[in-house]
Amino acid sequence: LSPDGLSRVFFFFFCSAAVEVALKMSFHSHANQGKPATTRFIALRNSYHGETLGALSMADIPLYRQVYSPLLLEPLFAPSPDYFGKYEHETDAQCALRCAAELEAIMAKHHHEVSALILEPLVQCAGGMRMYHPVYLEQARRLCTHYGIHLIADEIAVGFGRTGSFFACEQAAISPDFLCLSKGLTGGFLPMSAVLTTEPVFESFLSSERSRGFLHSHSYTG
């Protein structure tokens, strides 16, 4: 059922934990491959990814972020391609392509220090149910591949059919490097989340050196 290439799964127990896992795993995977300088992330304006510190760092909603801002990571924020930002006489697709061009400018300048781009595919839910054209996802995937940046798709709120396809990414016919899932995963009966990732990411952690392993757990949890 998952998008092509996502053959490995890391399970956890609540929504923003999946985002924390994806952020850490992306950075650690790059570091294991000799790229320890990729300490930054790109997120979209008006985004929301949860309220633990890493996830909150990727958010752009002052209500949640402002009071904790001294504690947070500082991502590079790219313009949101949502329809609210359309220029007069601009189509939905043209708006998405214009914002993708601005995303490319950020990547061209900062790709050497960026680990991943994180986004909510098609709908920014907590940001006001703001929607955007699937062509933006196509361009985001192309740019991430070109610049060697991971693509994290946070489908915690939009996965499992909520946008019309089983996963929102399917509407752009793309596969991210990390797919964050929760909510619909258990139909609300059990708090659980999952991060799906690729075989190359998984293999980047295979080593007899413990420091290269993904040591992410809690000593007592549900």
Residue ranges and their predicted role:
Residues 1-222:
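Conserved N-terminal phosphate-binding loop of PLP-dependent enzymes in the Aspartate aminotransferase
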